[in-house]
């Protein structure tokens, strides 16, 4: 069970730790400290869920914690939702193996946050209530836009959940000795408990606690590494170059992507996909007003940026302290557990078994924080967008909507467990890439254009959104990851790893073309309503949810 925690840290919601599933290694010895910390963490978070359940009485409480989260708290929770085990272990592993390239990768994740800060956060909060579909459908036709938005959200949520569950099961099995199926079921049960009873309030505090633990653990590791080199970066880099097999090449870029098109596609997916992730967007509705939403992004960007700096130091520290140490290698000379275990081995090197146990607990917290946010986002898409607004046309009562949401949480739990078991032996890196690509190709264009382009109509949004979604899925299937590696064909039809460059362009062109050619009465009315939406987005007048709700 202790090893269960350690695995969590490697759980990989982002593309970075794709190859963890394919890597094999020896299981770690039993760590009693990790077992104790695991039990303490689960007990504490279940108590938080019980406390949150007493305060969660309405639909607003369940979806958005009543809008009572402060900007600082929300910024910390967003960071907890975004700083995945992949970010910690995956990027650290990239730095460990490739050096400078790992930093380039982390910048791709980080750069999306200023986009959210300057383009989206304020207007999103002023226009929406529970989901981003509230914003996209503000002046457009409710039913078709909400269906598209919900399906796009569910695609992203499902792919992320698969990544989380498979990653959790594999790593728990590797590190803790737990049976894979047992590990997946355990994560699924805890995920359902947090969201089912505690809603957004419990999810928020689990994410905040996880962020604090992860930042504290990473800070300690980075400080210990810098202490060894007398807090001199030149010494760190020189000694890392001296022991790394690639030598000075680790200080140069160029090893992560095979061609400029793939690099650009990946960059676009990481940059703009962040602004279309439903579980991230949903967090902006937990604060009282646009001012707090801006603060949320400001604090989140600071925490996340600081964290990525730490991962860079941790990666080079692993080169220095882990790679030359035979105790972290198996009989073949490979790193035990694969390169994604570099940061975990570094925890043992700088802090012994006690700190290794702490990092194991943080790993488990990382899994639960991310899957809880994903589950709530998926449940709200079904209950609020599909049931309450698309099916019931906005006439569903609050009690029925909450019932549907909680039923959806349980169903998502079963689906997550089932998919985790089904995809046990599958390389799931492409799922994470597809999740970002779908978010960038379907959700992001609809959100951006609906808020900023007065000529957007329902017809344009639907055509552009569906084209972006379908193109992203089709190109990923025809690409080398699925078409060649999984389906066994000799050559891919689409030669690049990621589709975002093309699917995003198609989505924007489709939205533009079918909007400017829309001369219907409905289209003209939607253009006229943009001014009302613009005033609301800038001032928050008529805002429907917050502390006073």
From Swiss-Prot:
**Topology with respect to the bilayer:** Multi-pass membrane protein
Q: Which GO terms describe its biological process?
A: plasma membrane acetate transport; sodium ion transport
Question: What Gene Ontology molecular-function terms does this entry list?
Answer: acetate transmembrane transporter activity; glycolate transmembrane transporter activity; symporter activity
Give the residue spans that cross the bilayer.
32-54, 75-97, 102-124, 145-167, 182-204, 211-233, 263-285, 298-320, 361-383, 404-423, 428-450, 462-484, 494-516
Q: Which domain of life is it from?
A: Bacteria
Q: Where in the cell is it found?
A: Cell inner membrane
Keywords of this entry: Cell inner membrane, Cell membrane, Ion transport, Membrane, Sodium, Sodium transport, Symport, Transmembrane, Transmembrane helix, Transport
Q: Name one GO cellular component term.
A: plasma membrane
InterPro entries with a match to the protein in the record? Cation/Ac_symporter_ActP (IPR014083), Na/Glc_symporter_sf (IPR038377), Na/solute_symporter (IPR001734), Na/solute_symporter_CS (IPR018212), Sodium:Solute_Symporter (IPR050277)
**Which CDD domains does this entry report, sorted A to Z?**
SLC5sbd_u4 (cd11480)
Q: Which family does it belong to?
A: Belongs to the sodium:solute symporter (SSF) (TC 2.A.21) family.
The role this protein plays is: Transports acetate.
Q: What is this protein called?
A: Cation/acetate symporter ActP
Q: Which organism is it from?
A: Photorhabdus laumondii subsp. laumondii (strain DSM 15139 / CIP 105565 / TT01) (Photorhabdus luminescens subsp. laumondii)
């Amino acid at each position: 069970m202790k090893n269960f925690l350690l695995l969590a840290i490697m759980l990989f919601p982002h593309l970075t730790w794709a190859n963890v599933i394919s890597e094999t290694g020896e299981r770690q010895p039993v760590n009693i400290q990790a077992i104790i910390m695991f039990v303490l963490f689960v007990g504490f978070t279940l108590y938080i869920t019980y406390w949150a359940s007493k305060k969660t009485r309405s639909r607003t409480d369940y979806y958005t914690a009543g809008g009572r989260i402060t900007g600082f708290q929300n910024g910390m929770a967003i960071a907890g939702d975004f700083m995945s085990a992949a970010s910690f272990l995956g990027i650290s592993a990239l730095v460990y193996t490739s050096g400078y390239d790992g930093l380039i990768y982390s910048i791709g994740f980080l750069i999306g946050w200023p986009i959210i800060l300057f383009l989206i956060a304020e207007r999103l909060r002023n226009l929406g209530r529970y989901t981003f579909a509230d914003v996209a459908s503000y002046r457009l036709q409710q039913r078709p836009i909400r269906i598209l938005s919900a399906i796009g959200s569910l695609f992203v949520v499902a792919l992320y959940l698969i990544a989380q569950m498979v990653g959790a099961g594999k790593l728990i099995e590797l590190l803790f000795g737990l049976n894979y199926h047992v590990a997946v079921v355990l994560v699924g049960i805890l995920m359902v408990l947090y969201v089912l009873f505690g809603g957004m309030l419990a999810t928020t505090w689990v994410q905040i606690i996880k962020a604090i633990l992860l930042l504290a653990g990473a800070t300690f590791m980075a400080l210990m590494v810098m202490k060894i080199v007398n807090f001199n970066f030149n010494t760190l880099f020189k000694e890392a170059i001296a022991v790394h097999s690639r030598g000075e090449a680790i200080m140069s870029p160029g090893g992560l992507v095979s061609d400029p098109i793939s690099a650009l596609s990946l960059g676009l997916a990481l940059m703009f996909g962040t602004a279309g992730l439903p579980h991230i967007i949903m967090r902006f509705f937990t604060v009282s007003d646009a001012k707090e939403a801006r603060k949320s992004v400001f604090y989140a960007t600071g925490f996340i940026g600081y964290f990525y700096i730490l991962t860079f130091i941790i990666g080079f520290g692993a080169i220095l302290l882990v790679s030359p140490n035979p105790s972290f290698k198996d009989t073949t000379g490979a790193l035990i557990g694969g390169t994604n275990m570099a940061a975990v081995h570094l925890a043992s090197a700088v802090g012994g078994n006690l700190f290794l146990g702490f990092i194991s607990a943080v790993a488990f917290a990382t899994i639960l924080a991310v899957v809880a946010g994903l589950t709530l986002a998926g449940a709200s898409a079904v209950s609020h967008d599909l049931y309450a607004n698309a099916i019931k046309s906005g006439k569903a009562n609050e009690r029925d909507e909450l019932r549907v949401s909680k039923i959806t949480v349980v169903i998502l739990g079963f689906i997550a467990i089932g998919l985790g078991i089904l995809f046990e032996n599958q390389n799931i890196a492409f799922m994470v890439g597809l999740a970002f690509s779908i978010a960038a190709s379907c959700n992001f264009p609809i959100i951006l254009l609906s808020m900023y382009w007065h000529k957007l109509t329902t017809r344009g949004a639907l055509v552009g959104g569906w084209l972006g979604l379908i193109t992203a899925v089709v190109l990923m299937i025809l690409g080398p990851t699925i078409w060649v590696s999984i389906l066994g064909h000799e050559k891919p039809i689409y030669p690049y790893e990621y589709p975002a460059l093309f699917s995003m362009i198609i989505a924007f062109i489709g939205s533009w073309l079918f909007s400017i050619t829309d001369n219907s009465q409905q289209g003209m009315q939607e253009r006229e309503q943009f001014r009302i939406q613009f005033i609301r987005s800038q001032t928050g007048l008529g805002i429907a949810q917050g502390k006073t709700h």
